[in-house]
């Protein structure tokens, strides 16, 4: 077998003959012997295509994904059912391989998808303008920080510790780039953002306040008072939202939130080891020209026919770099298409029914586990509990083919014994009861 499939021995012989070289050694004659490797590389022997396929399959078989076990892990990425309709459309060649629709006259299908996606996100969030997607949730949060900096030029960003840790880290990274700093606000004893601490942190130097609904622990926040406290000095209020909870929760726009962002993986995109997915971004109309990415718009041509165009293109490849608000490329458009198809498949009633189903199963699971809740208040799809023997629970559950949830101690030292448990429509009551049996073996008496 040839070492490289792209150049066989006869190929190399022909190339050497063409340049008048007798051997490969002749090509390296100018390189001193004392710096040349005089042995074969320490690499395994080459494989045929079939051998490579079999080897990779054996490696992949060692993984235990959501299809090989019952998973209650969430923490921002969730095991939702992806209907066949979604991938039957996203895998069509017309959508699978396009680039930015620079020529709208031949890209009407792709542009209409962007427009319909923006419309759906605006309706979900209760905000009038949306872009055509960003990379994922955390960078969408961070991009909102940049918008706030463009808007008021203040130097401080205030973030609740209820915001996803990855989002807070990404926000801090972006903030260093545009000369801001991030100040974090703690959670109260019930796992919600501490309103008094938030009010104390917001001052005349605050550019924006970042919240999450539901927050990372699954707590449904009281957005009204939090948004009011955030905006009392003229700061922007940014809220990261879980789109599939908006069938049962009020949209952030109704609370006076300026920018709503979020992770789109739950909308028709598989877990896929954490990506790719897409981020969404909606805002009040006054921020339209400072929003990141592309915005598709509806228009009419010279003959009065309905058409679609890229109305705003504020990425650095389209305008002067110093005027750009983002470097987003076309990479997430296919994932956003999946999100649009999924929302159309659900419909207005479907998203309500799904939210209600998740809420019922979440409350049933919290009661069935019987463990001390970290956040005893309202929850929709996720809740946090303290586990007396967390290692024991995880070990026993994993041996039974159950992933019991996400260890909170990774991100919250104060919850070293905490477990974050997520529910979707794929988790049945039988699955919950199976986890509850493991919880019963480690359960301590919970105070009344």
Located regions from the model:
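A common structural junction motif
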Residues: 399-406, 439-447
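Conserved C-terminal alpha-helix-loop-beta "cap" of PLP-dependent enzymes
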Residues: 349-434
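Conserved PLP-enzyme active-site core in the AAT-like
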Residues: 139-305, 370, 387, 392-395, ...
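Active-site C-terminal subdomain of aminotransferase-like
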Residues: 267-369, 373-376
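N-terminal entrance/gating region of PLP-dependent enzymes' catalytic architecture
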Residues: 35-116
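Compact, charge-rich alpha-helical regulatory domains located at protein termini
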Residues: 1-38
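General small-molecule cofactor/ligand-binding pocket signal
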Residues: 130, 181-185, 374, 405
């Amino acid at each position: 077998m040839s070492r490289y499939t792209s150049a066989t021995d006869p190929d190399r012989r022909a190339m050497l003959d063409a340049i008048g070289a007798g051997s490969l050694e002749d090509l390296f004659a100018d390189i001193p012997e004392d710096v040349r490797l005089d042995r074969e590389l320490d690499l395994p022997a080459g494989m045929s295509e079939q051998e490579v396929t079999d080897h990779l399959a054996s490696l992949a078989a060692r993984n235990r994904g959501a299809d090989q076990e019952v998973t209650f892990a969430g923490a921002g990425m969730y095991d939702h059912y992806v209907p066949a309709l979604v991938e039957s459309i996203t895998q069509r060649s017309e959508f699978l391989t396009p680039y930015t629709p620079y020529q709208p006259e031949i890209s009407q299908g792709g542009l209409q998808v962007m427009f319909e996606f923006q419309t759906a996100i605006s309706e979900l969030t209760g905000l009038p303008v949306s872009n055509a997607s960003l990379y994922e949730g955390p960078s969408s949060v961070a991009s909102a920080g940049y918008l706030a900096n463009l808007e008021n030029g203040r130097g401080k960003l205030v973030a609740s510790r209820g915001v996803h840790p990855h989002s807070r880290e990404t926000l801090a990274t972006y903030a260093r780039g545009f000369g801001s700093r991030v100040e974090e606000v703690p959670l109260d004893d019930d796992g919600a953002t501490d309103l008094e601490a938030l009010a104390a942190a917001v001052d005349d130097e605050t550019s924006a306040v970042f919240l999450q609904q539901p927050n990372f622990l699954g707590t449904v926040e009281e957005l009204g008072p939090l948004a009011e406290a955030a905006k009392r000095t003229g700061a922007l209020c940014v809220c990261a939202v879980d789109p599939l909870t908006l069938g049962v929760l009020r949209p952030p726009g109704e609370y006076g939130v300026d920018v709503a962002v979020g992770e789109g993986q739950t909308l028709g995109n598989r877990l896929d080891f954490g990506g790719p997915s897409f981020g969404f971004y909606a805002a009040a109309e006054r921020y339209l020209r400072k929003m990141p990415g592309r915005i598709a718009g509806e228009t009419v041509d010279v003959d009065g026919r309905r058409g679609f165009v890229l109305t705003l293109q504020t990425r650095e490849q389209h305008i002067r770099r110093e005027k750009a608000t983002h470097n987003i490329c076309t990479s997430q458009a296919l994932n956003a298409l999946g999100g649009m198809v999924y929302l159309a498949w659900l419909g207005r009633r479907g998203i309500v029914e799904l939210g209600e189903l998740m809420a019922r199963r979440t409350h049933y699971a919290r009661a069935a586990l019987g463990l001390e809740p970290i956040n005893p208040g309202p929850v929709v799809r996720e809740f946090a509990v303290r586990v007396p023997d967390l290692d024991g629970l995880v070990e026993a559950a994993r041996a039974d083919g159950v992933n019991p949830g996400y260890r909170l101690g990774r991100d919250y030292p104060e919850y070293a014994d905490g477990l974050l448990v997520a529910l979707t429509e794929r988790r049945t009551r039988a699955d919950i009861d199976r986890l509850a049996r493991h919880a019963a073996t480690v359960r301590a008496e919970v105070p009344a």
